[in-house]
Amino acid sequence: SELAICGYPIRDLDRLMSFYLAAKNAGRYLVIDIKQAYLLKLFSGSANFSKLYPSPKDEAIKIFIPRGSWGLLDKDMKVFSERQLYMDYAEWQREFLDYPNKVDYRDVSKNQKDFVFYCSDFNLQNLIDIKPNPGSSYVRSLTEPFDVEMELKEELIKNWFEHFGVISKERD
């Protein structure tokens, strides 16, 4: 009933498709990472693979625009120019700033019930701005840890989600 957060390997387009279909069937948008949007764009432009995956402009997909390195995303554009905003992103990312289905943390935060939000282990800081509501959920579709380093990483991720009240502090 609140924000649904999902995690899976960023280049695993089959898992992306699973979450895409689940979000669509639930009447929600799948919010994907800008890198995933780029991958979908490449497949959409391919003669052989264009029908395998949805276009990054698909009506059931939203593209999450993170803060750039200067953090101008939510700043007053009367003070900063549009050119400066675009320069805050890598060249390959800039085209997605003009997509009609782009969203940023403000959109996700305001309309949490409308989204299944992809959040990789490397972008957990986006949760600081989004502030998941109580009752939000997390589905982790990743390999179970099989060494100490992976166990430590999983513990770190659990701590983030516990902090935001997405998962319970009770542990096995």
Region locations from a protein language model:
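Acidic/His-rich, metal-assisted hydrolase cores and their charged scaffolds
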Residues: 1-172
